[in-house]
């Protein structure tokens, strides 16, 4: 289908984009990579009268280090995450997980900020950002504010990002030495959303788990942080029984929507399997 008619705007700065959002209000949508918005427009699920293309704003791109924090511009594309020496060295989970997102063509256009701001539970970066304890810098008419990933996602297509705000950057603490990490994603084919997915970041002290973050993809209206799974592992020995207990805790909070990828029972069971796989893979990487 052909999208409805719209007016096109191409601001050159974040301030200009924010001003346009304030002027045009709910009739406007930001255009990043376009892989989520444009299909919705073709199906008439979204019918904005104005598109604000933020691809020409240089400050929204790039990856840099600020002390122990990695700063990623919201318009940074997936392939830049994969190829970045900074991300490979300091946040290898993001570099590896980006390879599992969609296909090469999409990874050349799709942006990390767009994936997050869209608020779809099947997108990969919401769970990843929760697992790595990311914070999002948002700019609106009253200046900038920083919000944690944990709590940013309110429901399907619903986030804390206001309609007059632009996501500027993602700030992530670099992994400490010895950190283990993994992202396990079950999908039907290359390019598909996850049937179920799990991101894990952990550290150990001897045979004891000293730090653990678990987040789930596409098994609820939002990405989920698994606090119950964390409590079953933190400060405890890493055993088969502890891993199973964490998986059981994840299963208990799943509320997946039924679709062509499977019914609720199947997706819930697969979430438990992804948790176990991710925990074991992350533990094996702990130094």
Curated annotation (Swiss-Prot):
- Which principal EC class is assigned to this enzyme? oxidoreductase
The cross-references to Pfam families, in alphabetical order and at most eight, read:
CO_deh_flav_C, FAD_binding_5
Q: Cofactor note, please? A: Binds 1 FAD per subunit.
GO terms for molecular function, please? Answer: anaerobic carbon-monoxide dehydrogenase activity; carbon-monoxide oxygenase activity; FAD binding
User: Could you tell me the keywords of this UniProt record?
Assistant: FAD, Flavoprotein, Oxidoreductase
Spell out the reaction equation it catalyses: CO + a quinone + H2O = a quinol + CO2
Question: Domain of life here?
Answer: Bacteria
**Which positions does UniProt annotate for FAD binding?**
32-36, 111-115
Key word Phosphoprotein present: no
Disulphide bridges, residue numbers: none
Q: Which cofactor does it need?
A: FAD
Q: What is its EC number?
A: 1.2.5.3
Ranges for domain FAD-binding PCMH-type come to: 1-177
Q: How does it assemble?
A: Dimer of heterotrimers. Each heterotrimer consists of a large, a medium and a small subunit.
PANTHER family recorded for this chain? XANTHINE DEHYDROGENASE SUBUNIT C-RELATED
**Known role:** Catalyzes the oxidation of carbon monoxide to carbon dioxide.
Recorded protein name is Carbon monoxide dehydrogenase medium chain
Provide the species name. Answer: Hydrogenophaga pseudoflava
